[in-house]
Amino acid sequence: MHICILSGSTLGGAEYVAEHLNDVLETQGFSTALFHGPSLADIKNEKIWLVVTSTHGAGELPDNLKPLFDELAKNQSDFSDVRFAVVGLGNSDYDTFCYAADKVEQVLQEKSAVKICETLKIDVLNVDDQEGYAEAWLPNFIEGLK
């Protein structure tokens, strides 16, 4: 089974989590492709998306992921053959905590993509080991693939 991991990061935290999940999935026998800021053309044939994103500014997607989701929002295609899950990193001191993860989920569901498990929201204020926290959530994602 092939998994496309998309990371959107401003300061590197989401990128580190995405890379860690990529390594764990490969160790477990999955085929993966890791993209830091892909275009829609890069991933148009991918059917399983694991999106790992931080929230930037006032609840925005990071600059390296925003163009993809802007393009998706405007695209008229049906993405019902795409299954996805989202990992969001944010700071609960802000009222826009993990808004980027919510936006990703909203755009994908509007395009009929199928959410396979609950979104993981990591509060960087309270979770020191974000990679380990995401790894502990990973069985939920894998179960959703079945």
Segments predicted by a language model, with ranges:
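A short beta-strand-loop structural module common to alpha/beta enzyme folds
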Residues: 29-39
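FMN-binding flavodoxin-like domain, especially the glycine-rich phosphate-binding loop
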Residues: 7, 12-19, 23-24, 28-31, ...
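Extreme N-terminal starter segment of soluble prokaryotic enzymes
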Residues: 1-4
